[in-house]
Amino acid sequence: DMARNIRGGMPKQTPEGYNRPIDGQPDPWSPFDPKFGGFWEGGTHWSEVVRDDAIEFMGHAKKSENPFFMYIAFNAVHDPRQAPKEYIDRYPLSRIKMPENWLPEYPYKDDIGCSARLRDEKLAPFPRTENTIKVNRQEYYAIAEHMDEQIGRVLENLEKSGMADNTYIFFTADHGLGV
């Protein structure tokens, strides 16, 4: 009987978030600048908005004797890979490791339908460089950690509410292609 905060869809995509960074050129994108919209739409990070919605929902659900169903859709770690600056700073590029199987271009990409026209392949320019891979990983790690902390706050609130022992939690995701 209670539906709240129905928020559908993905954050607004901006062209500056794709095909970057290009070595030797200034990066037009900043993962922590709200001017690019995306996860910063309205000035608050989307994962924090979703967290607050979930906590508010649990407050209403606690007042009822009936069981409740809550579906929380964190769009992170999806692109655009945006996180607060403090999270980006936790992952200096000098400490980001390159995958052992890294190639500037995957030789069979066209054969498997993974051409440069595919949206996830537009996240970085071809040929890929070590700097590009490290920047993309830095942003991915930062947004993943930020989302993880928001989920932790939801779980802390669930524990404090006294409803945790009578709650099932299912965590699923469809992310990872762009990393």
Residues of each region from the PLM?
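Active-site-proximal cap/lid insertion segments
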Residues: 2-179
